[in-house]
Regions:
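N-terminal Rossmann-like FAD-binding beta1-loop-alpha1 element of flavoenzymes
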Residues: 22-49
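FAD-binding beta-loop-beta segment adjacent to the flavin cofactor pocket
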Residues: 386-395, 447-474, 478-481
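Mobile amphipathic helical/loop "lid" adjacent to a hydrophobic cofactor/ligand pocket
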Residues: 70, 84-85, 89-90, 94-207, ...
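Mid-domain catalytic core of redox enzymes
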Residues: 2-8, 19-20, 103, 252-430, ...
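A conserved FAD-binding loop/helix module that cradles the flavin
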Residues: 479-501, 505
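Glycine-rich FAD pyrophosphate-binding loop
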Residues: 41-65
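N-terminal glycine-rich dinucleotide-binding loop that anchors FAD/FMN and/or NAD(P) in oxidoreductases
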Residues: 62-87
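Short beta-strand to alpha-helix junction loop
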Residues: 75-82, 159-163, 174, 216-240, ...
Length: 521
C-alpha cells in the first residue's frame, strides 16, 4: 500500500501487449471501490485503487480521538445482506461482525420498554407474535398491522410506479395511523433509508420490508461490528488487495479522466484507452470535537499532499466509485446520454449525525436499542469496540454510548453544545441510571452527505453500471443496484461494475470468472 507523497513512484505494468491482462484503475476506496478492486484483481486484472483520503473504507471509517477509536457513523447490517456478508468473508472478518442468533431488538420509550423478537416460525409468520404483543401499538393498531405486510408481498420494488409514491401515504392507505407509523414502521425505514418514512420512496421501502422483514425468517437478524470500521473494512481490504497484487494509492485525488484513441499508438503497443490525471486531495477536517465525516480526513488536521501532482495513470478500464456529485464532474460528457449526468444532481443528499456520550459509570447493559417518543433513534454501547474498556484508568467504569440519527436534517448544523442540551436529558429519560451519572465527554460526528435522498423519483435517476464508453463503469450505492443506499448496495454496485467490465471487454485476458462473493446478480 502506498500513500501518495511517499518515496515510491507511481507504478503500473507499462504498455499492454496483445495478450496482457487489462490495466484497471478504480477511483474511490469505499466499499464499492474495494469490492470492485478485489473482484477485478481476482479476475486477473492489474488493478490500481486510488483513494483521496488517507485510508480506505469511505463512509465506513474510524479515527482516533484522545486514544479512543471512533467510527464516524454507526453501521449495522442484516442477514439478508448477502453481498456485504460475502465481502466480510473475503476479508476474513465474518467473525468480527457477528449476526444475532435471532432478530431481537429492545425498543425504549421514556419510562417504558418493549422487545421485538422473532420466533422460530418460517417467514413471514416469524414476526407476527412479536407484533401482536407490541405494547407501543394500541389493540386497534395491532389488529391491522398485518394489512400492509400482506399487501407488500404483492408489490414489485422494480415497478417504476412504486417509485412515484410515498411510503407514508401507502401505509396510511393500508390502515396504519400516524402513531403506528412512528412507533413501528419508522424504526426500520428511517434507519435503512435515511429519510423520514412518510417521505421515502415506496419502491425503496418495499425492498427493505419485503427482503428484510417478510423474507426468510433470519433475513432481519442484525449484525453489529465488533471491531472499529477502519479495521473491519479498510485495513482488511488493504491487506487482501496487497496479497492479490493490486496497488493501493492513498491521498490520491483524481482531477480528470482523459479518453484516448487506443488505435493511435505507434508500433504494436496500443495506447491505453484512458489516462487518469491526479490532483491534490481535499482539505482539512473540521474542528476537534465536532467532526465532519464528509471531510477528507476526520482523524488528522491536514490531509497528506499528493507527491506527484502531475501524475497520470494509463488504464484500459476505469471504475468510477465515487459519490454521485464527484462522478458527474469526472465522467467525460460524451459517454452518457444527454441529460443523464445532470440528473444525478437531483439525487440530492441526506445527512446522518452521531452523538457520542461517555459517562463516568455504566448506565445500561443493552448492547443496542431503538427508541420512540424520543429524539433518540438508535443507541449503541461502544465501550468495548472503542478501546475505552481497556484504556480507562484503574477503578474507572466509564461507558461510551453513541446515538445514531438518520434523516438528520434538523441536527446537522446544530452546535454540539445545543445537541448536548437535547440528547443528554433524552438519554436520561430512557436510561434511569444516567440521571445520576456524570458526562465525562461529549462530541458529535456529522456525515452531511451520507446517502442520496431516497425520496419518490430517486430510483429513476440512478444509472446502471455501464456507460456508452466501453471500459468506463460506475459504482457506488447511489447507482441502480436494486437496493437502497446501504453497505449492501455499495458492495453490489462494485460487483456489478466488475461484471460489466468483463461483459463489455471479452477480449481481455481475464481469469475464468469474476467473483460474485456469493451473490446472484
Amino acid at each position: 500500500m502506498t500513500a501518495a507523497g511517499g518515496a515510491a513512484p507511481w507504478e503500473h505494468p507499462g504498455p499492454r501487449g496483445p495478450e496482457a491482462p487489462p490495466r484497471v484503475v478504480v477511483i474511490g476506496g469505499g466499499l464499492a471501490g474495494i469490492t470492485a478492486a478485489i473482484a477485478l484483481a481476482e479476475s486477473g486484472a492489474h488493478v490500481a485503487l486510488l483513494e483521496a483520503r488517507p485510508r480506505l473504507g469511505g463512509a465506513t471509517c474510524s479515527f482516533t480521538r484522545d486514544g479512543l477509536v471512533v467510527d464516524t457513523g454507526q453501521h449495522i447490517y442484516l442477514g439478508c445482506c448477502t453481498a456485504y456478508r460475502g465481502l466480510l468473508g473475503k476479508l476474513g472478518m465474518t467473525a468480527h461482525a457477528p449476526l444475532q442468533p435471532r432478530f431481537d431488538v429492545t425498543v425504549l420509550a421514556p419510562g417504558r420498554q418493549a422487545r421485538l423478537r422473532r420466533t422460530a416460525l418460517p417467514g413471514p409468520l416469524h414476526m407476527l407474535p412479536a407484533l401482536a404483543r407490541y405494547p407501543f401499538l394500541s389493540l386497534a393498531e395491532r389488529a391491522v398491522v398485518s394489512r400492509p405486510a400482506l399487501a407488500m408481498r404483492g408489490l414489485d420494488p422494480a415497478d417504476p410506479a412504486l417509485d412515484t409514491q410515498r411510503f407514508g401515504d401507502w401505509l396510511a392507505a393500508h390502515g396504519q395511523s400516524t402513531h403506528a407509523r412512528r412507533a413501528l414502521w419508522d424504526l426500520f425505514s428511517v434507519s435503512a433509508l435515511n429519510i423520514a418514512g412518510d417521505d421515502a420512496s415506496l419502491a425503496l421501502a418495499a425492498t427493505v420490508v419485503k427482503t428484510g422483514l417478510l423474507g426468510r425468517s433470519n433475513a432481519a437478524d442484525i449484525g453489529v461490528p465488533a471491531l472499529p470500521l477502519g479495521e473491519l473494512h479498510g485495513d482488511a481490504a488493504a491487506t487482501l488487495l496487497a496479497k492479490l497484487g493490486a496497488q493501493v494509492h492513498l491521498g490520491a485525488k483524481v482531477g480528470a479522466i482523459e479518453v484516448n484513441d487506443p488505435a493511435a499508438g505507434p508500433g504494436t503497443s496500443p495506447r491505453p484507452r484512458f489516462l487518469v490525471h491526479l490532483a491534490r486531495p481535499a482539505g482539512p477536517a473540521g474542528p476537534a470535537g465536532d467532526v465532519d465525516a464528509s471531510s477528507a480526513d476526520p482523524a488528522t488536521a491536514t490531509a497528506p499532499e499528493v507527491g506527484y501532482p502531475a501524475a497520470q495513470l494509463p488504464a484500459d478500464a476505469v471504475v468510477l466509485a465515487v459519490p454521485h456529485e464527484a462522478a458527474a464532474r469526472l465522467v467525460p460528457p460524451t459517454t452518457l446520454p444527454v441529460g443523464t449526468v445532470n440528473s444525478w444532481s437531483a439525487l440530492g443528499a441526506s445527512p446522518i449525525v452521531n452523538v457520542h456520550v461517555i459517562y463516568d459509570r455504566p448506565v445500561t447493559d443493552l448492547p443496542f436499542a431503538a427508541a420512540i417518543d424520543s429524539p433518540v433513534q438508535w443507541v449503541f454501547d461502544r465501550t468495548a469496540i472503542s478501546g475505552l474498556a481497556l484504556n480507562q484508568p484503574a477503578g474507572s467504569r466509564q461507558q461510551y454510548l453513541a446515538i445514531s440519527l438518520s434523516a438528520a436534517d434538523d441536527y446537522v448544523d446544530v452546535p454540539a453544545a445545543k445537541l448536548r442540551e437535547r440528547f443528554v436529558p433524552a438519554l436520561a429519560d430512557l436510561f434511569p441510571a444516567a440521571r445520576d451519572a456524570q458526562v465525562a465527554e461529549f462530541f458529535v460526528t456529522r456525515e452531511r452527505r451520507a446517502t442520496f435522498r431516497q425520496a419518490p423519483g430517486s430510483n429513476a435517476l440512478r444509472p446502471k453500471a455501464g456507460t456508452r464508453l466501453p471500459g468506463l463503469v460506475l459504482a457506488g450505492a447511489w447507482t441502480d443496484t436494486g437496493w437502497p443506499d446501504t453497505m449492501e448496495g455499495a458492495v453490489r454496485s462494485g460487483l456489478a461494475a466488475a461484471i460489466e467490465l468483463r461483459r463489455t471487454d471479452p477480449g481481455s485476458e481475464w481469469n475464468a470468472s469474476t467473483s460474485t462473493m456469493g451473490v446472484r446478480q
